[in-house]
Amino acid sequence: MDGKAPAAYVDPAEFNEVMKRLEKIDEKVEFVNSEVAQRIGKKVGRDIGILYGAVVGLLLFLIYVSVSSMFTI
């Protein structure tokens, strides 16, 4: 080896066909990645909604307890 990278000569038609197949594969990979990200986002959104609901419920309970304790003897 004289330090040069090996060169390969490919028929342009074959090269274009391979590039089209690679583009299709890339589109499928991007689609799957976006679906996975969307599912993760839905799970995170659900968890945040549950936490907000718990906090609001706790605040309402504390307000109820404090208001009801003011009117009892």
From Swiss-Prot:
Write down the InterPro entries for this protein, in alphabetical order: THM_MeTrfase_su_G
- Lipid biosynthesis found in the keyword field: no
Give the UniProt subcellular location, in the record's own words. Answer: Cell membrane
Question: In which pathway is this protein known to take part?
Answer: One-carbon metabolism; methanogenesis from CO(2); methyl-coenzyme M from 5,10-methylene-5,6,7,8-tetrahydromethanopterin: step 2/2
Give one Pfam family.
Answer: MtrG
Q: Which GO terms describe its biological process?
A: methanogenesis, from carbon dioxide; methylation; one-carbon metabolic process
Task: Give the reaction(s) catalysed.
Answer: 5-methyl-5,6,7,8-tetrahydromethanopterin + coenzyme M + 2 Na(+)(in) = 5,6,7,8-tetrahydromethanopterin + methyl-coenzyme M + 2 Na(+)(out)
The residue ranges crossing the membrane are 48-68
Q: Which domain of life is it from?
A: Archaea
Q: Name one GO molecular function term.
A: tetrahydromethanopterin S-methyltransferase activity
Q: How does it sit in the membrane?
A: Single-pass membrane protein
> Does the record's keyword annotation contain Transferase?
yes
Q: What is its EC number?
A: 7.2.1.4
Q: Which GO terms describe its cellular component?
A: plasma membrane
Keywords, in A-Z order = Cell membrane, Membrane, Methanogenesis, Methyltransferase, One-carbon metabolism, Transferase, Translocase, Transmembrane, Transmembrane helix
What's its job? Part of a complex that catalyzes the formation of methyl-coenzyme M and tetrahydromethanopterin from coenzyme M and methyl-tetrahydromethanopterin. This is an energy-conserving, sodium-ion translocating step.
> What do we know about how this protein assembles, alone or with others?
The complex is composed of 8 subunits; MtrA, MtrB, MtrC, MtrD, MtrE, MtrF, MtrG and MtrH.
Describe the family membership recorded for this protein in Swiss-Prot or TrEMBL. Belongs to the MtrG family.
Q: What is this protein called?
A: Tetrahydromethanopterin S-methyltransferase subunit G
Q: Which organism is it from?
A: Methanosarcina acetivorans (strain ATCC 35395 / DSM 2834 / JCM 12185 / C2A)
